Amino acid sequence: MNIQEYFSRISFDGSHKDADLQTLTAIFQHHIQAIPFENLSMHCGETIDLDLQATYNKIVKKKRGGWCMETNYLLFWALKEMGYDICVLGGNSYEPAKKAYTDEINHILLKVVIKGSSYIVDAGFGGGPYQTWLPMLLISGKDQPQIPGIFRFIEDNGIWYLEKVKRKHYVPEGSVPLTDNPEMGNIRKLYSFTLEPKHIDDFQELNAYLQVAPDTILQKKSICSLQTTDGFYALVGWTFSEMKYKYKEDADLLQTTTLTDEEVEKTLKDKFNIVLENKLIPVNVRG
């Protein structure tokens, strides 16, 4: 594994001699704009190994993406190599249908400490408009505006909660809007976490379980999403979506199209720079 090869993969050629916030922000943004959040392996007959060398080979050498445990694991390795004070944390994602956080940890995120201040860095929550674009200062109750919207942490009795203020979608004629629950109000809860450091091996069982559990969104939907300079692309099953943030003062532009199987393959190559070794079986089960 080679840090320069990783820099090339994310198209980063800036200075990295200082493990500071400016460099962290640059690496993070290059990472999320080059490495898709995707679960395509489980929909084309591949096994996902939570092993650093396997993750490196998949994402850096084969130019694939990965789900949270892969893309954040790679980012953890890179930042560690660069000299950052960093640790892995475990998160419990919010399930809107159940109006509750999951009982078990099902997400990986990273905590970076710079000059005594802690920042949360998460490159693996990219299946929609909830991917942060900047490292988030670990402070409770403070709005942290970013291009995708306003994020904030709320801390309660040692548990931290990440939420985002929703923005309106401007949907041109002929497009189909993303589904959401209007009764949930203006705030979208994302996940909870504690500051207890984790080891990557703590997620081996989860990594294996998510590949076979029948009722998870990862089984029900083939997902590939990538942040762009002004929004994101998302391919869910046969539905391709493109969002541009702040298209209007109070709304983001959302355009969606339905693709054929052949167009799915072409879109993966053209929009996400992904060429799969095995045949993808697109999936998009509602609910």
Swiss-Prot record:
Q: Any idea what this protein is called? A: Arylamine N-acetyltransferase, liver isozyme
Q: Which residues form the active site?
A: 68 (acyl-thioester intermediate), 107, 122
Report the EC code(s) recorded for this entry: 2.3.1.5
Pfam families given for it?
Acetyltransf_2
Enzyme superclass (EC): transferase
Molecular function GO labels: arylamine N-acetyltransferase activity
Q: Which organism is it from?
A: Gallus gallus (Chicken)
Q: Which InterPro entries match?
A: Arylamine_N-AcTrfase, Arylamine_NAT_domain_sf, Papain-like_cys_pep_sf
